[in-house]
Amino acid sequence: MRASAGERERVEALYAWERRLQRQGVARIAGVDEAGRGPLAGPVTAAAVILPPGLFIAGLNDSKKVPPARRRELAAVIKKESLAWGIGWVSVKEIDCLNILAASRWAMRRALSALAIRPDHVLIDGMELPGLKIPQTPLVGGDALSASIAAASILAKVARDELMVAYDAVFQGYGLAGNKGYPTREHREALRRLGPCALHRRSFKH
């Protein structure tokens, strides 16, 4: 289906930060975002993506604004069309040993390390990565401001959701395939009834 002029304009506007850096001579720009800071269960997942300059992907947006089925379609396109992409994970045990902010930063670092191409600059959603030896720009609400971060937000969300669906068959009774570990009413009721499983974060209030 052909994208409307308005949709093309919207997606092109997401490249404003990338174009600004490219005008300064920066070639390879990675967007980084995480998923899973708020759940009671499961890992924190991050993704890093380097897109070709100006690549048009119809529907590209902050993952929270994209329906699940469309997110999966977009993830496949992003993996196929990107110059490089990587996923980083931080386990429940690591989250409990660190804290959720530190765990999110570690997931982002691991996603960057998983890239087959080293970026020249990193656009990060909402936070800075201390000690990163690559120039970086943190953008609050970056998944709605940068195409690269939006692409990363989709990959991170899809990867984590798929894992939580798989975990639902192992840790039954918590509805993980539906709630993805987030603190829904049904999830909290299951916790009261069953107690926490190995996937639940002990450092979070249940």
Swiss-Prot record:
Top-level EC class: hydrolase
Entry-linked PROSITE patterns: RNASE_H_2
Binding residues for a divalent metal cation: D33, E34, D125
Biological process (GO), any one: mismatch repair
Catalysed reactions, semicolon-separated: Endonucleolytic cleavage to 5'-phosphomonoester
Cellular component terms per the entry's GO annotation: cytoplasm; ribonuclease H2 complex
E.C. number: 3.1.26.4
Disulfide bonds: none
Pfam families linked to this entry: RNase_HII (PF01351)
Role noted for this protein: Endonuclease that specifically degrades the RNA of RNA-DNA hybrids.
Family the UniProt entry places it in: Belongs to the RNase HII family.
Protein name as annotated: Ribonuclease HII
Species classification: Bacteria, Bacillati, Bacillota, Clostridia, Moorellales
Gene name linked to the record: rnhB
